C-alpha cells in the first residue's frame, strides 16, 4: 500500500467531515430520541426520578460512549482496516488464517448485526413520528397510536421502495441534514442546561458507579440495558470506515460526541426542572419549545430516515461480503448507482421491510421496541472484540497485553449483554430468533461447502491433455463451440473437479478450439482484480485464476474478455478470425459457459448430520440466485449440466436377474 493512499485515507477534509456525518453517525446520532425516554419509563416515570438518578444516568451514558465508542472503536478498531475497509467481515479476513474457528464469531457477529439492522428503522422512525404528540395542532391525531403506526409504515414503504433505484440522488443531502441535526442537538441541549449547570458533574464516573448500586435505581444493574441504547451505533463507525476514511472519523467524532452528550444533558436538565409536572412525554421533544416542535419532528424524521438508510445499505454490503466469503447463499445483486459501493439485493431488501414492518405492528410503540433493542448488538460487539484480540496479536502486540485489553472490553460488553438479556422476555426474543435463523443459514451453507470439498473427486488435467487434444482435432465430432469455459470451485495446481472432465469427455464429447478452466478466488483485499494464466504448454488449454476482492462483483465474462485480448496480443493464444461477423476485424470467437451442478448420487459415506446439512442446503438453493446471474452470465451462451457427485467407491450395486422358468409340460 503506497504512502499516498495511506495519507489520503488518514487525511480529513471539510467535504469528508460532512459526508461522514451523513453516512457514519445516523444510528448513534438518533439515539437521543429514545435513550432518556427508556431510562425514565423504566424508572416509573418523570415523577419517580431524583437528581442522583439523573446524574448517574448521564454519567453512565458519557462513560459508555467514552469506553466503547471512543476507545474501543475509534482509537483501536479503526486501526484494523483491511485496505481501507472496515466491518466484522473485513476484520475476519485479516485474521482467518490464524485459526479456523474464527469463522464462528464472524458468522455470529454478522448475523446479529443484520438482525439489529432490521429493528433500527422501526425504532428510529417510530420515535420520530411519536414526537407529533407534542405538536399542539396535531396532538389530538397522534395521541391515537394507530395513526403513528400508519405514518411510520408509509415512510418505511417509501424508504424500502426506493432502494431499487439507488439512493445516490438523495444521498447528497444526508451530510448537510445530519450537520443541522447534530448542531440542533448541541445547541438545544446547551440552552436547556443553563438553568441546571450542576448536570455537568456527571462527567465524574463516581455518579455512574454510585447509581449502579443505589437503592434509588429500581432496576439495579439492568439499567445498563437502557444505557446501552446510547452506543448501539458504535459498530457503524467501524463498518463504514471505507466510505469516509479514518481521518474524517477522527475529526468528526469529537463534534458528534459533544453534540449528543449536550443533548442528553439538556434532556436531563429538563427532567430535573419538570419532575413534579406530571408530563409524560418523551423528554427529547418535551424539552423543545412548543412553537418549534413541528420543525424538530420533521428534522428528527429526516435523521431517522438517514439512519435507517445507512443500516439498510450496510445490510446489503454485509450480505454481499458474506456471499463472496461463501458463508451465505447467493442472491441476485444489482448496482443501481454509479459506483460499486451502491448495491441492491432485492431479497434482502424485502425481508428487511417485512421484519421491520412486523416489528412496528407487533410492538406498536417505540417504548416497547426499545425493550427489545440493543440485545443483538451487544453480541456483535463481543464477537468484534474476539476478532480484534487476534488482530492485535497479528500486528505484533504482545499476547498478554492484547488479551488484557480485549478481556477488559469483553467484560464490559458482557455486563451490557447480561443487562440486556432481561429484554429477551420483553421482545428481545424477536431479534434473537432472527439472528439464530441467519446463523443457521450461514452454518448450513458453510458446512455444506466443506462437506463437498471433503468428498469431491479431483483429477489431474495433465493426465487428460492428450485426450482433449485428440477430441479437439477429431472432425468426426461437430464443433461444439469455439471457446468452452468451465468455472471450477476447486483448482489446485493441475487438479480439477472430476465432473468437468466427465462433462468434456464422457457426458457428451465437446469439441472446441480452446478449453478454458476458470477459478474465482476471493481475496482478503476488498477491491482486488488480478489474474494468473497457465497455458499448460498448449494453445488450446487455458487455466485462469481470477483473484477478486470480497467486495468486487464476480462478472466473469467481462474479465475474461480482457484476458483473451491480453493473451492474443502477447501471442500466447492464436487469433480466432470470424468468417461471418458484423464487426470488422473481429478476432475473438464465440464462447459458451458450461455450469455444472453436482448432485449427491450416493450418500452412503455421509453421516446423518452431513446428510441433513446437504439436504437443507439443497432446499435453500431453490430460493437463491442462479450461478448464471451470480457470475454475470445472463447475456452469454450458457449450458447447465447436472452430474453425479459420487461420494462412495461403490460403483456397482448387486442385482439378480430373474430367469423365467419353462413350463415342464411344454
UniProtKB/Swiss-Prot annotation:
Statement: the UniProt record of this protein carries the keyword Ion transport: yes
Domain of life: Bacteria
A Pfam family this chain is assigned to: K_trans_C
Catalyzed reaction equations: K(+)(in) + H(+)(in) = K(+)(out) + H(+)(out)
PANTHER family: K+ POTASSIUM TRANSPORTER, OSMOTIC STRESS POTASSIUM TRANSPORTER
Cell compartments where the protein resides: Cell membrane
Function recorded in the entry: Transport of potassium into the cell. Likely operates as a K(+):H(+) symporter.
Gene Ontology MF terms: potassium ion transmembrane transporter activity; symporter activity
Name of this protein: Probable potassium transport system protein Kup
GO cellular component: plasma membrane
Disulfide bonds: none
Bilayer-crossing regions: 16-36, 58-78, 100-120, 141-161, 165-185, 221-241, 253-273, 292-312, 343-363, 373-393, 399-419, 424-444
